[in-house]
Amino acid sequence: MVERLGEFAAVELKYATRPVDVKIDRFGEPLRTHCLIVKNQAASDLIMYNYWKDVRRIEALTQCYPAVKGGVALIVTNNVTYWREPRTDSGYRAFSTYDGNTRSPGLLQWDTDIAESVRRTHSDFELLGTYPCRWA
């Protein structure tokens, strides 16, 4: 939360990465050990789901608390999966964050080909607002 003059804004941040593996030199010599700079965070579909749950949480906060005026949800990533449009038969399409996508009010739910275990732990939910996805 960010507060200014008694008004609040919620801030939600996701940091989703793909591995970055580089050779590093120190003191004019390559490091002798393997150096993984950024680790791989798999399950991008679940991270996207959690992103939209963050948006829903901000909506709920603004509904419940008059002092909360809004918020922002961000994903910081080096993984193109988040800004590229998924295939039309993708099971997570409803939760996609691709560039140019606009999420309209309504129910967000998994496609029928998603595993039952995912459906049990990541239930459908509704968004109240309209949210454009823009990547820079």
Question: How does the language model describe each region?
Answer:
Residues 2, 7-23, 28-38, 58:
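Conserved catalytic cores of phosphodiester-cleaving nucleases, focusing on short active-site segments
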Residues 30-120:
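Acidic, metal/cofactor-coordinating or nucleic-acid-engaging core segments within structured domains
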Residues 123-136:
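C-terminal edge-of-domain segments
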